[in-house]
Amino acid sequence: MRGSCGKSNAGRHLMRAALLWTGIVTGLAGYGASARAGTDDDAQQIEQCSRLQQAHIKDTRVELAQIVPAQSRFENVDGTVAVTSAPVCRVVATVSTAPKRKLGIEVWLPLDWNDRLLGTGKSGFGGFIDYSELTSAATRGFAAVNGDTGYKGSGSGEPGKLLDWAADPEALRDWAHLSVHPMTVAAKEIIQAYYGRSAKYSYFSGCGGVEAMREVEDFPDDYDGVDARSPGVYYSQLMQSFLWGAMLPARQPDALLTTDALALLNRAVLQHCGGAHALADGFLDDPAQCRFDPAELQCKSGDSQANCLSAAQVQQAKRLYSPVHNALTGELIYPGFARGSERGWAAIQHQLAAYYAQPLLASSVFGDARWDWTTFDFGADATRVDRHLSPIVNAANPDISRFAARGGKLIMTQGWADAINAPTRPIEYFNKVAERAGGVEGARRSFRLLMVPGMGHCGHGPGPTTLGGSSPPTEYSPDRDVVSALQDWVERGKAPDRFISTKYANDNPNDGVKFERAVCAYPLQARYKGSGSRQLASSFSCVEADAESAGVANR
């Protein structure tokens, strides 16, 4: 399960797309023509890999075990391509999680192995193998594993069509609880069979943030270090927040905040709360301090609509900034989005409700493919969802003591400009962990939370994005890469407090660095020193955040 979400027929860029293997361009025959061809080592590697098809792995059937040469291409359904940089032994397998339920996995075993396993996650509802995650991990020398969460799909649902795996309570429970653990157990056995030794350390990284947290909370022995990106740990409430964000435009179309309206609103927010620096940067350093009221943009008589918002649009903006509560119990369903996230609001106004909340709730709670999500009642229906779905799909247990006791380390990253998973939810989770751990320092012995200004969901956005995983870091060092930081923490005891995150020109590493920022582990936050270039991370220092800057204010 799947960090949070983000894909529709009109907006596949919102999630890490499902990567489906479409054939290796060079082909296995090409391996013999590579620079390593013709050597005894080649033949040995090919034989060693192919023997895995006869290996006895518990509850697992190996369907394919072949050497994949460097420069092999794996095509994404949206046309993007992942390319291997070195040969790997590619293992395709099926893991039985129940008599009639199976989990598809792939394990990639680099010939030059670093003695470590990296489990990887996926976005949305899953249903696919994420080859870009596998390629990235194997390139760094990790034995890598990724799974399809137990069904075949493209990461989202379709309005008016039931999700088979969500309509079956046992299959839904497997999807929520057994998407990562069985693939991890199988991967460790496959590693032992191939290399003749077990991994010294095991790590998990993904968006996929809920998958990551399920491992920390329920299967603490699987991984030594976990990188959880933008995790929607209150998953059933996240689905309800999608309905909240889309409800008013569905009932009152003139409330829709268009692309132009969102740009207008965002500029006003940046100007009001950050001035010239924020306008130049494109994001706020400290969104929790911002109190901009969208009513300031409401059209007055004679105003041009191009320069103001209608009354209905102002109402929609206020809804998206505001938390939604259960109308019967008063309990928080989900907090509002931070000021400065406005340019990412297109999907929350329709697509996330139609392609995620509607199919999942129709299948698992209401039992009717035709269920009309616009009739959702945030009292009775919200209570029903909490009763039937929350215990199954949520991964918000703040008791991570078993993981901490065995020396496990968790780094969670969350963008302040995330327009899918409201950013104060991870802060709330951290604070609950701290309550159980005897305070913030108790939590920080095993848990670091990184709140990244200007970053969207799992990267992206106007701010520095490399810590979110949407772009590679400038180097894989502990101060620039979360997995490297986990290795330093787990293996050498060096706890991280300050990172450097990068924004590339045009969001393309090939176009060079646009700017870099310091990112500090909560409750610290980066603050400009008052001198030096704002394009340099060295111009920012880590200081203690006050209550508002910690994200309490917009609750």
Where are these regions (language model features)?
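Cap/lid segment of the alpha/beta-hydrolase catalytic domain
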Residues: 114, 123-196, 240-241, 248-251, ...
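Glycine-rich nucleophile elbow surrounding the catalytic serine of serine-hydrolase chemistry
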Residues: 206-214
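Alpha/beta-hydrolase fold nucleophile elbow
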Residues: 197-206
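Catalytic-loop region of hydrolases
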Residues: 35-116, 129-132, 280-284, 293-371, ...
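Bacterial N-terminal signal peptides
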Residues: 16-30
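A catalytic-pocket lid/entrance helix-loop region that shapes and gates access to the active site
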Residues: 213-325, 451, 465-478
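Short beta-strand/loop motif that positions the catalytic acidic residue
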Residues: 412-414
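Conserved alpha/beta-hydrolase "acid-adjacent" motif
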Residues: 420-424
